Amino acid sequence: MPQAHRLTLPTLPVKRQLENKLIWNGARSVEKANFFTIGYTGRTTKELITTLTANGVRTLVDIRQNPISMYRPELSKTNLARLIEEHGMIYAHFPQLGVPRDIRAKAIESGTRDVIWEWYDQHVIAPFLGRNLHYFLNCVEHPVALMCTEIDPQECHRHRLSLALEHMGMTGFDL
């Protein structure tokens, strides 16, 4: 299958992604966080659950627009929701916080995620802060973890949400 159909961008080696994650979290504190972000790549479902429960997460907010994993069916919406609920947490899917396929395709064509960030800030963050932040803060049990796929939060749209929430006075940490 041609790369454009898989909708992937060049990805850094896992070691570098983990280093970037440490840099991202450098000025943040897990103890002071009132929300979390998390990527599931490179984790077993057991590791995902252990990380969430160890940090007191009450609600996992899935911010993938299309919550299906072809490679890891246990992380598709129905299976993941069941797993999360079996461990006493709440699963919530917020597809409006995801990135549409056509925007990801444009990023691939350009070879940079900047296309995603620009689109996301304009079409998701601005309305989210303007209309949906109150709903988001009051419709789920806290603390929440915003979940997507990537290890490095800076390679994922969840970092844009994190920056927006931090701009509003909240404190985040990537698990």
Per-segment meaning from a language model:
Residues 13-175:
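Residues lining hydrophobic/aromatic ligand-binding pockets adjacent to catalytic sites
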Residues 7-12:
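Short terminal hydrophobic/aromatic SLiMs and anchors at protein ends
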Residues 3-5, 17:
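Low-complexity, intrinsically disordered or signal/transmembrane-proximal segments
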